[in-house]
């Protein structure tokens, strides 16, 4: 399975690997630095070869004039470069914010909640991906195509997928049953919450195995690519949406407490069909949400923390839409529903 992106992007100036948009154009770090230095110095540059020099990764240093012109042609804007004075002021403000940062301490109750979630996660979810190899995977799933010794024949990909997904849902159910707050709810509400959140929690946990470089899921010795999902029978458009979600979430570089709190927020959703104690479940979700907010605020400032809580709320909403689409896909893949009645029940 691959992400929804098209792989590494190229610098619009020299063709090297781009690191992002700099001064309004997609460029590499080298061309970003060159443009800033050249514009800041404000020196007149002249090409000795009539302005026809080739600018690529190997030759970009040969003619500064042509390189600057190509920067401008690519859309880089001089007015976006801060003056030396403005740059000093910005760095001073950043340093001041770091100096003024005071960590938010979790309350005793919040600490206990985090520890309970982490403990249940470690017992039931943390190691489940390494166990996928027990479900007789096809040979091509092994990393580097090097098979491990398995005493029984491999399963077809569809059957392997069904068994792995059933196993994940079973472990997620054990995870939730290990949470006192969840067990305190009536059984009918536990069932309703699990039917709504089990697949979402699976994907939150699965995100820890997603590799941004390869756009694959690395589960122990196994590697799952987008093409595997296509072979199972999922629509490629759905898989691209799913992989784009995982890439976005993975880039946030969440810590384990943030992952488990995100999973708990998905679990304690008071708007799931069939729940009876909506106010109580709403209170549990609020407690979880406030704990997540406090945990994020308690970490040293990092660029990825900017609006992190709001980003996670948006991703939870997106995940719910993906879950609905996933249920539809499961119903329409021939023979799959019969192979995993537990997931069929959850998605119904």
From Swiss-Prot:
Gene Ontology cellular component list: cytoplasm; cytoskeleton; nucleus
Main location: nucleus
Keyword DNA-binding: yes
Chain positions found as Phosphothreonine: 38
DNA-binding region extent: 8-83
Keywords on record: Activator, Cytoplasm, Cytoskeleton, DNA-binding, Metal-binding, Nucleus, Phosphoprotein, Receptor, Transcription, Transcription regulation, Zinc, Zinc-finger
UniProt xrefs under SMART domains: HOLI (SM00430), ZnF_C4 (SM00399)
Gene3D superfamilies in UniProt: Erythroid Transcription Factor GATA-1, subunit A, Retinoid X Receptor
Molecular function GO terms recorded: nuclear receptor activity; RNA polymerase II cis-regulatory region sequence-specific DNA binding; zinc ion binding
Protein modification: Phosphorylated at Thr-38 by PKC, dephosphorylation of Thr-38 is required for nuclear translocation and activation.
Domain (NR LBD): residue spans on this chain: 109-348
One Pfam assignment: Hormone_recep
InterPro entries: NHR-like_dom_sf (IPR035500), Nucl_hrmn_rcpt_lig-bd (IPR000536), Nuclear_hormone_rcpt_NR1 (IPR050234), Nuclear_hrmn_rcpt (IPR001723), Znf_hrmn_rcpt (IPR001628), Znf_NHR/GATA (IPR013088)
Single biological process term from Gene Ontology: positive regulation of transcription by RNA polymerase II
Family: Belongs to the nuclear hormone receptor family. NR1 subfamily.
PANTHER family xref list: NUCLEAR HORMONE RECEPTOR, NUCLEAR RECEPTOR SUBFAMILY 1 GROUP I MEMBER 3
Quaternary structure (record): Heterodimer of NR1I3 and RXR. Interacts with PSMC4. Interacts with ECT2. Directly interacts with DNAJC7; this complex may also include HSP90. Interacts with CRY1. Interacts with CRY2 in a ligand-dependent manner.
Protein purpose: Binds and transactivates the retinoic acid response elements that control expression of the retinoic acid receptor beta 2 and alcohol dehydrogenase 3 genes. Transactivates both the phenobarbital responsive element module of the human CYP2B6 gene and the CYP3A4 xenobiotic response element.
Entry note about domains: Composed by a short N-terminal domain followed by the DNA binding, hinge, and ligand binding/dimerization domains.
Name of the protein: Nuclear receptor subfamily 1 group I member 3
Gene name per UniProt: NR1I3
């Amino acid at each position: 399975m691959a992400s929804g992106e098209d792989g590494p992007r190229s610098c619009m100036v020299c063709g090297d690997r781009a690191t992002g948009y700099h001064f309004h154009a997609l460029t590499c770090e080298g061309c970003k630095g060159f443009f800033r230095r050249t514009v800041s110095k404000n020196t007149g540059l002249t090409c000795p070869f009539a302005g026809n020099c080739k600018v690529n990764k190997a030759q970009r240093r040969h003619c500064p004039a042509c390189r600057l012109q190509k920067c401008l042609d690519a859309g880089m804007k001089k007015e976006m470069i801060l003056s030396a004075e403005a740059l000093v002021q910005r760095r001073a403000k950043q340093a001041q914010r770091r100096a003024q940062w005071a960590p938010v301490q979790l309350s005793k109750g919040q600490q206990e909640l985090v520890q309970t979630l982490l403990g249940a996660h470690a017992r039931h979810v943390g190691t489940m991906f390494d166990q996928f190899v027990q479900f007789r995977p096809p040979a091509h799933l092994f990393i580097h195509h090097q098979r491990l010794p398995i005493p029984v024949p491999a399963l077809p990909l569809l059957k392997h997928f069904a068994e792995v997904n059933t196993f994940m849902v079973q472990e997620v159910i054990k995870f939730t049953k290990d949470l006192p707050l969840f067990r305190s709810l009536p059984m009918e509400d536990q069932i309703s919450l699990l039917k709504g959140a089990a697949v979402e929690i699976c994907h939150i946990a699965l995100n820890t195995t997603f590799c941004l470089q390869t756009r694959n899921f690395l589960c122990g010795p196994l590697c799952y690519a987008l093409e595997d999902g296509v072979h199972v029978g999922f629509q490629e458009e759905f898989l691209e949406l799913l992989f784009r979600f995982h890439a976005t979430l993975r880039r946030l570089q969440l810590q384990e407490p943030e992952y488990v709190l995100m999973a708990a927020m998905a679990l304690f959703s008071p708007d799931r069909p069939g729940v009876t104690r909506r106010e109580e479940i709403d209170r549990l979700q609020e407690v979880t949400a406030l704990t997540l907010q406090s945990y994020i605020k308690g970490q040293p400032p990092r660029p990825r923390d900017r609006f992190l809580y709001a980003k996670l709320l948006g991703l939870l909403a997106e995940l719910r839409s993906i879950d609905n689409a996933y249920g539809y896909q499961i119903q329409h893949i021939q023979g799959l529903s019969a192979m995993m009645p537990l997931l069929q029940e959850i998605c119904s």
